[in-house]
């Protein structure tokens, strides 16, 4: 007979996985025995484009697991945000020359351009988007749409060229004392006042800057835009409050942020560099040098390396499921959904989120392990015997493309919430409230990306496309697990993962 939470019947088929979800404090939580031999090097959860460091993710590391104990869910201290439709907005021990080669690989190189097909774009919403005009950065001189950061300010092509010609040719204009108003249509009428306006807003030949906009300038600009948006569209303030709440919850739920992982991978940290594992010898050295949270039992040292690594990944995945579940509780409206639907949403969403966040720990050459203490090379993982050598390659391919989008933790916090609240998961009982929550999250994500990446007009569509890619990766992962189940008869999956994978794709 199924357990109940209030009036919500709990499908007994969900078993232990349902124990990760809301239950009254008086109810006992079923404990899942996770006692299983494993090797303590695990993979984590995140995403990496290491040339530009941003915010949040996981690491592959093993903690002692005897039980999976999910605490009861209580309503988060959060002021409800209405779900009505709003108008948008990765050593020091040098074994040989080959190690030095891999050490240099830790620095992330520019990722290849992301694949995107407009034909597969998700969530095309037929509502008006006045946000486009609100987000257009205006020329500080005439108010036309700015083409970039020119001579120290944001300016359009016309005013940039006008200022350049004036300075280069040392032009002197007839004085005008009328203080003419300079705007898009009148900017060519009074050259004197136009040049004075250029100087007044801060244009200077000495202010030419190359490369990306300085962070301080970017923050100032975003603050100005945000203020204007909130005044013109008060509902956007609710979306930004939602984004901040999700970011705060994300930071509390996940131990290794994308920003920290990128700092490790790019060497921009005061901590020592991660220990590089690229072959069997370095693997054995790593087991001595890296401070794993769980000591591998001596009797397990004889197990084949591929199996030990695979089992280690399993236990990290279990830990990740717990972290994701805690995060999901803090998504406004999630704990009010039917309990069976909460289980279903997590069952289908956790691995998509794991691979999203795993990307933060990756570059094209390898992945951070054990909370950034180690770096296991892509080639080493790829050369493990089949089918184990096939598991990580699709994740690396996805990470390279996903990292090219340069999302930071504040972006990822909303993106993974959108993944969780997917109303098209099989077996959902009440789709409407799920879609309502996701629709609000999508609007918050769109606004967040426009504010945080004003130069990337198509980023929202590209990010949503990655949701389709993630589903394909999970499908392929499950298919490989079926192969292992048939070929590795002496090895079993973790009970919680068995439950998640059951009937999954």
UniProtKB/Swiss-Prot annotation:
Motif (9aaTAD): 495-503
Domain NR LBD: 238-503
DNA-binding region location: 136-210
Disruption phenotype: Mice develop abnormalities in circadian variations in blood pressure and heart rate, in parallel with a reduction of diurnal variations in the sympathetic nerve activity, and impaired rhythmicity of BMAL1 in the blood vessels.
Crosslinked positions (Glycyl lysine isopeptide (Lys-Gly) (interchain with G-Cter in ubiquitin)): 252
Gene Ontology molecular function: any one: DNA-binding transcription factor activity
Effect of substituting residue 112 to D: No effect on repression by PER2 on transactivation activity
Keyword set includes Transcription: yes
Phosphoserine, modified sites: 112
Sugar-modified residues: 84
Sequence similarity: Belongs to the nuclear hormone receptor family. NR1 subfamily.
Protein name, as recorded: Peroxisome proliferator-activated receptor gamma
Gene: Pparg
């Amino acid at each position: 007979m199924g357990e109940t939470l209030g009036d919500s019947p709990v499908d007994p088929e969900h078993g232990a996985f349902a124990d990760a979800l809301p239950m009254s404090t008086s109810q006992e939580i079923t404990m899942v025995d996770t006692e299983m031999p494993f090797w303590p090097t695990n993979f984590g959860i995140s995403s990496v484009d290491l040339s530009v460091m941003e915010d949040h993710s996981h690491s592959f590391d093993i903690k002692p697991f005897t039980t999976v104990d999910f605490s009861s869910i209580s309503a988060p201290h959060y002021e409800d945000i209405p779900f009505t439709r709003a108008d948008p907005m990765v050593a020091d021990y040098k074994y040989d020359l080959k190690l030095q080669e891999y050490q240099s690989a830790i620095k992330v190189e520019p990722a290849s351009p992301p694949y995107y097909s407009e034909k597969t774009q998700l969530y095309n919403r037929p509502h008006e988007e006045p946000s486009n005009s609100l987000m257009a950065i205006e020329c500080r001189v005439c108010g036309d749409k700015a083409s970039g950061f020119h001579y120290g300010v944001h300016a359009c092509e016309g005013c940039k060229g006008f200022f350049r010609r004036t300075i280069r040719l040392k032009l002197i204009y007839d004085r005008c004392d009328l203080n003419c108003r300079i705007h898009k249509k009148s900017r060519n009428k009074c050259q004197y006042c136009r040049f004075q306006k250029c100087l007044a807003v801060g244009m200077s030949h000495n202010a030419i800057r190359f490369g990306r906009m300085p962070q301080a300038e970017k923050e100032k600009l975003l603050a100005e835009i945000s203020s204007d948006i909130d005044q013109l569209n008060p509902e956007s303030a609710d979306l930004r409050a939602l984004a901040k709440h999700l970011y705060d919850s994300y930071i509390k739920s996940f131990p290794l942020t994308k920003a920290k992982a990128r700092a490790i991978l790019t060497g921009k940290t005061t901590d020592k560099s991660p220990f590089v594992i690229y072959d069997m010898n370095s693997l054995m050295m790593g087991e001595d040098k890296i401070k794993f949270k769980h000591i591998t039992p001596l009797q397990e040292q004889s197990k084949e390396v591929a199996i030990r690594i695979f089992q280690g990944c399993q236990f990290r995945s279990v830990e990740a499921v717990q972290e994701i579940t805690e995060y999901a509780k803090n998504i406004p409206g999630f704990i009010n959904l039917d309990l069976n639907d909460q289980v279903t949403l997590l069952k289908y969403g956790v691995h998509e989120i794991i691979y999203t966040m795993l990307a933060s720990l990756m570059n094209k050459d390898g992945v951070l392990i054990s909370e950034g203490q180690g770096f296991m090379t892509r080639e080493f993982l790829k050369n493990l015997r089949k089918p184990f050598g096939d598991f990580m390659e699709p994740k690396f391919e996805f990470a390279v493309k996903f990292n090219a989008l340069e999302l930071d933790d504040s972006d990822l916090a909303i993106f993974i919430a959108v993944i969780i609240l997917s109303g098209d998961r099989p077996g959902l009982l009440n789709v409407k409230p799920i879609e309502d929550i996701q629709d609000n999250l999508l609007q918050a994500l769109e606004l967040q990306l426009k504010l945080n990446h004003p130069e990337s007009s198509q980023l929202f569509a590209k990010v949503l496309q990655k949701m389709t890619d993630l589903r394909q990766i999970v499908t392929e992962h499950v298919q490989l697990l079926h192969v292992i189940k048939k070929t590795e008869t002496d090895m079993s999956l973790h009970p919680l993962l068995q439950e998640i994978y059951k009937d999954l794709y």
